[in-house]
A protein has these predicted regions:
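Substrate-engagement module of ASCE P-loop NTPases
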Residues: 50-51, 140, 172-199
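Conserved P-loop
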Residues: 32-121
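Short hydrophobic/aromatic beta-strand immediately N-terminal to the Walker A/P-loop
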Residues: 26-30
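Phosphate-binding P-loop
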Residues: 17-24, 56-59
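Conserved nucleotide-binding/hydrolysis micro-motifs of P-loop NTPases
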Residues: 70-74, 102-105, 159-160, 198-202, ...
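Phosphate-binding/switch loop-helix module in NTP-utilizing enzymes
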Residues: 103-182
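Phosphate-binding/switch region of NTP-binding enzymes
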Residues: 183, 190-226
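Pre-Walker A adenine-sensing motif
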Residues: 7-21
Length: 226
């Protein structure tokens, strides 16, 4: 039985978790808009990458993968640079970034010069759909199967993914996908974080999403004095 854990490297949190999340966990970062779920994920991986490998009961990732469904790498890295200047150089050299925004925006009305990188020249070939653009879910599954083993993965975000899926499938199919993702995460033996904005879905549906997870962390604005 594998009892290793993935620490968050947040000093106030790991003792509560008795060392961290069990390896193979799918963890939902559920938060009000801008309440800190992104900052938690980045702070955690930065501290983990900077931590000496000493504890044999602690699992250190093979790699850290950031999967973005709508934002390009430069956009995300700029936010990290502003929010965590002390960690930026270390993260940029060790973070494997996967941009699935082309798949997300494919066949939408968004003009190609908006969704493509500045380096992309408009041509006949650039207007063709590649395999990754044809199906966002298939592209995500394929990437996870190749990269998630022993890794920490951040999926940005479940809010975007769920809304995209529900335009193409029923609610029960989305829940089935999430349960499959939770099961697959055990095989990958790493840690998968995914972010969901509070209040996007009805309360019972949000709770159904939470039920698919191994753990849920809730981020809220301090309402003291309001």
């Amino acid at each position: 039985m594998d009892l290793t854990k993935n620490p968050t490297c947040i000093e106030s949190l790991d003792p509560v978790l008795q060392g961290g999340f069990p390896s193979g966990s799918l963890v939902l970062l559920l938060g009000e808009i801008g309440a800190g779920e992104f900052e938690f994920a980045i702070s955690s991986i930065a501290r983990l990458l900077n931590r000496p490998k000493q504890d044999t009961c602690t699992l250190f990732p093979n790699k850290v993968c950031y999967i973005s469904l709508t934002r390009g790498k430069d956009d995300v890295m700029k936010e990290i640079a502003f929010s965590f200047p002390e960690f930026y150089n270390m993260i940029k050299d060790r973070l494997e970034f996967k941009d699935l925004s082309e798949a997300f925006f494919a066949r939408s009305f968004i003009p190609i010069n908006w969704r493509c990188s500045l380096q992309t020249e408009l041509s006949f070939d650039s207007l063709k759909w590649d395999k990754e653009e044809e199906n966002l879910i298939v592209a995500l599954i394929d990437y996870l199967d190749k990269k998630a083993y022993g890794s920490i993965v951040i999926i940005d975000s479940l809010t975007v993914l769920a809304k995209h899926c529900l335009e193409r499938m029923e609610w029960k199919d989305l829940i089935m996908f999430l349960r499959g993702l939770q099961k697959a995460s055990k095989k990958w033996d790493g840690l998968v974080y995914t972010m969901l904005s509070e209040g996007i879905f009805e309360k019972n549906k949000q709770e159904e999403i939470q039920d698919c997870m191994d753990g849920v962390m809730v981020f809220e604005w301090d309402k003291q004095g309001s």
